[in-house]
Amino acid sequence: MSAKAALPLQMFGRRLVHLRSSVTSQNMSALRLYSTEKQPEEATEQKATESSPEVEKLTKELAAAKEQNAELMDKYKRSLADSENMRNRLNKQISDAKIFGIQSFCKDLLEVADTLGHATQAVPKDKLSGNADLKNLYEGLTMTRASLLQVFKRHGLEPLDPINQKFDPNQHEALFQKEDKTVEPNTVVEVTKLGYKLHERCIRPALVGVSKC
């Protein structure tokens, strides 16, 4: 083979060697790149796998803590409500004690008011104009009773005069029945003794007569 014919063959061989070297170099670079990219991914997956039980444990502990917190909050709210109810009951008891502590004393004073009322009713009205002393006595009794009733009112004690009202067993005590067609049945047609209430609580029922049914 001549030198001129061998020269192209040598050049082709050199190109082939260079090409193989280039391909091998690129493959190695790709392999290294693949290996480098794969390692962090594998490490992340491995780390996630290793931490999964711990995350599950923490999740369960968090759920348990939330449930316990909800229970404690519910107990706290119930305790506050119970305390508020107890405070209201105590305040009402104290208020009732202040208001109704004089109830028995008021009942005794009612007898005085009744006596004054009977005394004024007993005075003959037709003789007042001709008897100055009797008139002064009557006026004195009337003023005394009126003053006593004003004192009662200031302390929440008021009379019950249920004439022509519907009979109420909570405030009235029926002594007799009376025929009266001008009113509906069970209506108070006569009051023989006034009742009294202390701050809306009946402390003495009115003694009454009611119409027949």
Swiss-Prot record:
It is found in: Mitochondrion matrix. GO terms for molecular function: adenyl-nucleotide exchange factor activity; protein homodimerization activity; protein-folding chaperone binding; unfolded protein binding. GO terms for biological process: protein import into mitochondrial matrix; protein refolding. Residues 38-55 have a biased composition (Basic and acidic residues). CDD domains: GrpE (cd00446). The keyword Chaperone applies. One of its GO terms (cellular component) is PAM complex, Tim23 associated import motor. Residues 35-55 are annotated as: Disordered. Keywords: Chaperone, Mitochondrion, Transit peptide. It comes from the Eukaryota. InterPro entries: GrpE, GrpE_coiled_coil, GrpE_head. Essential component of the PAM complex, a complex required for the translocation of transit peptide-containing proteins from the inner membrane into the mitochondrial matrix in an ATP-dependent manner. Seems to control the nucleotide-dependent binding of mitochondrial HSP70 to substrate proteins. HAMAP family: GrpE. Belongs to the GrpE family. Probable component of the PAM complex at least composed of a mitochondrial HSP70 protein, Roe1, TIM44, blp/TIM16 and TIM14. This is GrpE protein homolog, mitochondrial. It comes from Drosophila melanogaster.
